[in-house]
Amino acid sequence: MLSLGAQTAMAQVPAKAAACLACHGENGNSTMPNTPSLAGQNARYIYLQLRDFQEGRRDNAMMTPMTAGLSKADMQELAKYFSEQKLTNKRFATDPEKVKKGIAKANETLCAMCHQGEFKGQNEIPKVAGQNFDYVVKTLKDFKAKDRNNDAGNMTSVASTLSEEDIDNLAHYIASLN
């Protein structure tokens, strides 16, 4: 049984978004470690990722079939909805020393050139500030291994220079941001 607050929140969710909430969480705040939170993400980025899943430029056993029946308008509505939600999940305890090392690595690799200061993102560049720690690690490893390549090679190129320690430190830093 849903609480009154949860029922009210669900009533405001676009019909097509209801299926998304099972993995991406209430209002787009994922509680699943390897699933990204969508709350507060750039609408353009969300739309492009949905389109990439649908058109086969990005592959995921769950997301590819989930996007199959979506129209352009559906994807735009979902992107708008999730971009307007507030990112609230902060459950990972970051290590301050690793955060410092992550800041240094982010500065060294010029992350802010694309992701902007404090990883706020812009347009088709994702906001990764406050993203799930495990998802950041997974994503960086996927780019490094070239298992994910729907970004014109930008992140693949950057991730190829990262060590396991660098990835861990960057994930601590990114997870520490709001």
Regions found by a protein language model. Give the residues of each.
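Inter-heme linker and motif-flanking segments adjacent to c-type heme-binding CXXCH motifs
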Residues: 29-30, 84-97, 118-126, 144-152, ...
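Hydrophobic alpha-helical segments typical of transmembrane helices
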Residues: 16, 45, 49, 62, ...
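C-terminal capping alpha-helices of c-type cytochrome domains
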Residues: 68-90, 134, 160-178
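Sequence/structural segment immediately N-terminal to covalent heme-attachment motifs in c-type
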Residues: 9-29, 90, 94-117, 132
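Gly/Gly-Pro-rich "capping" loops immediately C-terminal to redox-active cysteine motifs
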Residues: 28-58, 64-70, 107, 119-145, ...
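C-terminal segment of classical bacterial N-terminal signal peptides
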Residues: 1-9
